[in-house]
Amino acid sequence: MSETAAAQPTEATASKATERFRNGGKAVIATLAANGVDTVFGIPGTHNLEFYRHLPEFGIRAVTPRHEQGAGYGADGYFLVSGKPGVVITTSGPGLTNVITAAATAYAESRPMLILSPGVPTGFERADVGMLHETKDSSGALNRLLVSSQRTRTAEGAAQAVAEAFAMFASSRPVPVHIEVP
C-alpha cells in the first residue's frame, strides 16, 4: 500500500464521522473506531468523560490503570504486542503531564501513540480564570516534546486531527501525537 493510499481512508472516515456527529468526543471516538482502534488506556475524570461516554457505542474497550503514566506505558506496550498505535485518553493538567515520560519513551523508540486530552472551553485559552486543572498552553508545552501537538476547536477539526495522526503513523516515522479537544 502506498503512503498516499494509507492516508486517504482516514481522511474519509473523519468526514463521515463529523457528518453524523456534532459532539467532539463522539466524533473522535467514531474516528478512532474507523481507524481500527479497539482499546484505549487512561483514567476517566471530570473533563474527559465525553470521550469515555461513547466508547461502548463503538465497541472500544477502556483499560484504566491507577496512574496516567501506567496508561501511557500500557498504550506503548499495546503497540508492541498488537502492532496497532496505542491510544491514551488523559485528563487535563496533571493527567496529561503524567503521560509525558511514556510518550518520550515511545518517541525515542519510534512507536506510534495518540494522546487525547481535554482542554478548557474555546474562548478561555490562557484566560487564567481558575478552572479545574487549567493549564496555560498544554499543546504548546507538548509541541516542544513531540512532533505534533495541536488544539482543535470543532468536532470536525477533532475528527480530522485524529485521521491525520493515523495517516502520519502510516506514512512517516511513527511517534507520539497529542490532540487537545475542548
Model-identified regions with their sequence ranges:
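N-terminal alpha/beta PP-like core and its mobile active-site loop of ThDP/TPP-dependent enzymes
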Residues: 2-182
